[in-house]
Amino acid sequence: MYIKRLELTNFKSFGGTTVIPLLPGFTVISGPNGSGKSNLLDALLFALGLAGSKGMRAERLPDLVNHSQTRRGHSVVETRVTVTFALDAETEWRVTRRLRVTKQGSYTSTYAVNDQPCTLNELHDQLQAFCIYPQGYNVVLQGDVTSMISMNAKARREIIDELAGVADFDRKIAQAREKLDTVKEREERFRIVERELIQQRDRLQRERLHAEKYQALRLELQEREQWLLVRQWQAHEEQKVQLQAQIQTLQQEQTQRQEQLQQKAQEMAAAAVTLEQLNRQVKALGEEEYLRLQATLADLHAQQRQCQRQQAANQQQQEQLAEQLQQGQAQYHRQQAQHRQLAEELAQQRGDRTPLMTAVANSQATLEALRQQVQELSTAAQTWFQEHSQRRQRIDALIHELEPSRTELSRLQERSQQLRQRQGELHQAATALEGQQLELQDALTTAAAAIKQQEQQLQTLAQQLATAQQQLSRTEETYQRLEREQRQKQRELDQLEARQQAVQETQGGFAARLILSADLPGVLGLVAQLGQVEPRYQLALEIAAGARLGNIVVADDSVAAAAIALLKREQAGRATFLPLNKMARPKPLSPIALAGCIDYALNLVTFEPQYAPIFAYVFGSTLVFESLEAAREYLGQYRMVTLEGELLEPSGAMTGGSQRRPNTLRFAQGVPPQESAEVQQVRDRLGELERLLDRLLQERTHQQGRVNALSQALSEAHQSHRDRQRQWEQLQQQQQQLNRQQAELERQQQYLSQELTAAETELTHLEARLPELEAELAAERLALNALEASPSHQQWQQVQAQLQAQEKIHASQVAALQAVDQALGDRHRQLEQLERDLKQTEQEIQRLCQAQREMRCQQQALDQTLGDLATQIERTQAALRELDSRLGHLKGDRDRHEYQLRQQQKNYQQLEWQYQKASETLTTLQAQLQELSTIEPPPLPQPLPEVPAELSLRDIQQQCQALEQRLRAMEPVNMLAIQEFEETQARLKELQEKLAVLAAERTEILLRIENFTTLRHQSFREAFDAINANFQTIFATLSDGDGYLQLESPEDPFAGGLNLVAHPKGKPVQRLASMSGGEKSLTALSFIFALQRYRPSPFYAFDEVDMFLDGANVERLAKMIQQQSQQAQFIVVSLRRPMIEAAQRTIGVTQARGQHTQVIGLDLTAYP
């Protein structure tokens, strides 16, 4: 793209319409001073809207109209400039600006692109599409180089800001900050309402807790009262039921006892009479004979049992012997049967052997006779044998010749068939190979398409990874920048807090201040600094804590030891330390309900849970009372403090009076003191930074995971692409292999064709020769058959056949005889073994029979003994029965009746005593029941509540008294606080949800601002680095020296300016302000060229930028422009000879007689 044509109508010194054609490359405009050279560049600025009237050397836009037009007195005069760009060889793009000025001095200015009206902003948007920027340096006028030299460092840095697009980011940041201010304003309004609701909620919470506690106590008292009524009624009813049951039971028992006493008396009288009678009968009879007979009978019974056991054992042994004998006899019979069978088989085999021996002898004689006959016939047929042998040899020779031929014929036929079959196989293989080639070609096409698709996927993944890495880098840079700001703000806050801490009087004595200012790790603060109290209870709690408010709380005892060592070393006095790791855990405080008592002092202090052991140590079980009068009732029982500051000890000591504490330690109030606006501002910014860092850390983790995932996906895609590429290469190799196989198949087919032709030729020859050989062989066989048909030969053959048959018969007979002999030997050995077994079995049977006879004798003896014992037992039992019938019955009755009589007497006495005791108890119970019946029970609640079984009536009465005292102590109570607290809590929750949404929105906006800030820094840094590199290169070309751009504040470029540092050849390093005029111009031009190279445009226009340079520097500048003109169109206004000589063409400008500027063009390349 370049400027193809410039058309001016009544513009400044150009009267009428002047068309100036332009070409690509390097063009110089030259002419006398005041001829209107610079007006051409002003026309470009005017048409493209790149400068105002001041930039075009006019006070007002109407001054741009040619003066000859204004002097003619027309009501409206007009000037028009058209710039035509060549986009390519055929396409043009025109920009036209018209300025119409009225006689009154008013004017209108319009723009048109390709004859279509547009606004200036629309024109600039289209120009930017062609890399022509209003803030760029496409047109460098006479004053631009001078202004570059004279401008301050900040303005020079702002040039790079414009090129880097910093203004766009500033605009986005400003918009985000406006939205942030709106969000903050809403959040502040909500915070005010939140604080009011929190205060209201806290107040209502305390009142609600008090009301709920009062309500719970009241409900508990009502429940206990119901329990008391139920327990009283239950006790009354249970006592009545119990007495009635006892009375009824006793009455029934008394009736039964009376009946039993009468019955027992009658039974004892009858038993005494019977016992007396039995005693007289027993004395009349003797007992010694009875005892002797019993002993004899027992002895006989023992002998009988012993004999019976022996008899059972003998019987068992007899059964075993009988079984063994039966088994032996059965085995003996089986062995006898086997012996008879073997004897019969042996006799039969001996009978069969005799005929076999006779047959073998006869066969041997016949065989010898046949052998003699064969020998005689062989001598007579010698001549026949010779002729037969010759015929046989000839037949063999023909067969020897014919068989290889037949074999060869078969081989050739088979070879021909194989070759034809092989040809068919090769044809099929070639067909299959063509199919494989087609499939392989399809696979190659598919693989190539897949590779192309994977390459596109790789490109997409690489772009996504680059974008993700860029986002991660931006997030990381933002995170590091905010971290640096956080550290800076934290240091600033520490300094502010240190100054604020210096004016606070909450650090106790010198020792405490020294410890707190030493920054020892683990020092948590004074007791007074760790708790907050309400103003109402502050005096009482400070009096109760006393000097312990100045104790120093530390994390553990090692910190306390280090602090004590510091006090010793600095000689700063003494202090008490409370290490958290050694303080005893607080014990639960028992519920207290005393008149005038507010609560335990420990419960009135607000502190973090970790400091519970500290404040339990400070206050212990101290109680806070409303007044001294209420506390005096419990003097000596508790440690108490009143709201006015009186202290009552358990020992009875009382401390009180007036007190002034100008410098004592104080508890913190419920609301912390207001901080200064500066501290609050720093603290708010730290909070924002902390939220932003947390959010950035989350985003960095997420982005890092995305980068890792994309890297993994890209690596896998690369691996898949390599696999697919390898597969494609393998397919290509397979295709090459198939091509080689196809060539090999063609070669084999050609070879098989040759082999088949040769085999068929040889086969034809053999098929002609074989019939001749077969005919000759047939003739020889006929002659041999005729020879063999002679009578002598037939007789010899018959005898020979008989001999062979007889030899077979003889051999079979000899084998049969040998088998019979072998069987006879086996039978003899079996028979001998069986005879030995029979003998052993017979001996065993005899032994068992002997043992059986002995057992029968023993059994007979035992039977005799048992019979004798049975007779004796029978006689003894008869004697005992006789005595027993006379004595045993009477004696047993006597003993039994005597025992029964004693038991009856004992039972009667016991029953009589129980009867008397029960009568007394029954009288007492009847009196108690009469008394209970006269008492009426109180009304009971419905339904009846369940009372714990472990609680007695006295326990419930004590609980009711304690609950009544606690309720009286808690009055008055706001019972509406319960409902009001819930409503306030709901409103606060809804408001906090809105605040959470606003906080998230604010964090998002802050993060967006910080990201824009990071992009702003990155964009500036990229532009600065590129322009600095361009400046170094260009300055080295123009001045034979070196130079660079220097930021005044590299850490924060926007906080400082930009300096041009140059080192001309042969001179020390200098800043721009200390250079000469020519050096300044060269340095400024180097900077302008660096800016142009950073943001290249299709054309550049310079207006006498070489006016302050000497000849040598003009030559360098001209050479630089000549080199740059290869990439862009350069239009330079100059009067210097080196510049004109370096140009490709020159446009001459002069002032005509009619005061209009005229131009003429000259192509310098046509004049070498």
Swiss-Prot record:
GO terms for molecular function: ATP binding; ATP hydrolysis activity; DNA binding. It comes from the Bacteria. Keywords: ATP-binding, Coiled coil, Cytoplasm, DNA-binding, Nucleotide-binding. GO terms for cellular component: chromosome; cytoplasm. Pfam families: SMC_hinge, SMC_N. GO terms for biological process: chromosome condensation; chromosome segregation; DNA replication; sister chromatid cohesion. It is found in: Cytoplasm. Residues 521-634 form the SMC hinge domain. Residues 330-349 have a biased composition (Low complexity). Gene3D superfamilies: 1.20.1060.20, 3.30.70.1620, P-loop containing nucleotide triphosphate hydrolases. Residues 166-508, 673-790, 820-1011 form a coiled coil. ATP binds at residues 32-39. Residues 330-351, 652-679 are annotated as: Disordered. Belongs to the SMC family. HAMAP family: Smc_prok. Homodimer. Contains large globular domains required for ATP hydrolysis at each terminus and a third globular domain forming a flexible SMC hinge near the middle of the molecule. These domains are separated by coiled-coil structures. Required for chromosome condensation and partitioning. This is Chromosome partition protein Smc.
